[in-house]
Amino acid sequence: MINIAVCDDDLEITKSINKLLMKYQDERDLDFTVDLFNDGSGLKSSILKGKKYDLIYLDIEMRQMNGIATAKYIRSIDTTVLLIYVSNYDNYLKELFEVEPFRFMSKPINDKRFYMFLDLAIDRIRSANGIYCFRFNKDILTVILRDVIYFETVSYTHLRAHETELHL
């Protein structure tokens, strides 16, 4: 389960990001929870109640609590959450470095760029959480490393009518 927050005062952008996330989740058979916020104070309140996010999409200029103040608050509690800024304002780039964003995306959102950044974020989240993914037959299996006692590789090949047998 990957917990994602989207925080933007533009409802159309929030809906658009949510739609892209749902499409990505369905296409890749992943499990997301997505919380939507229209300002930084709502996101801050959710975090104060104990919600932990892996990835946050954040606008810079919002009414009650802007994206930079929100990110500073988030970083004071969680240094590992990935922040992707989605904004029309690139004149804040120097200030953004203080909160160590993962990526910056300009509006309007480019789907290809969005998915590229999301791929990178998912890879980073998986490696940080100790998740190991591997292909078995035609399926992609996922294992949480902290749940693994040990790995053992045993491969049997039986030639019976030109069939190969694999035991996992």
Give, region by region, the residue ranges found by the protein language model.
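Conserved binding/recognition cores within well-folded domains
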Residues: 115-160
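Alpha-helix N-cap recognition
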Residues: 39-42, 164
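CheY-like receiver
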Residues: 45-127
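Conserved acidic segment of CheY-like receiver
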Residues: 2-22, 56
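Short, well-ordered amphipathic alpha-helices
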Residues: 15-24, 43-44, 71
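Single conserved hydrophobic/aromatic residue that forms the stacking wall/gate
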Residues: 158-168
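Short hydrophobic/Thr-rich beta-strand motif most characteristic of the beta2 strand and flanking loop
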Residues: 25-39, 46
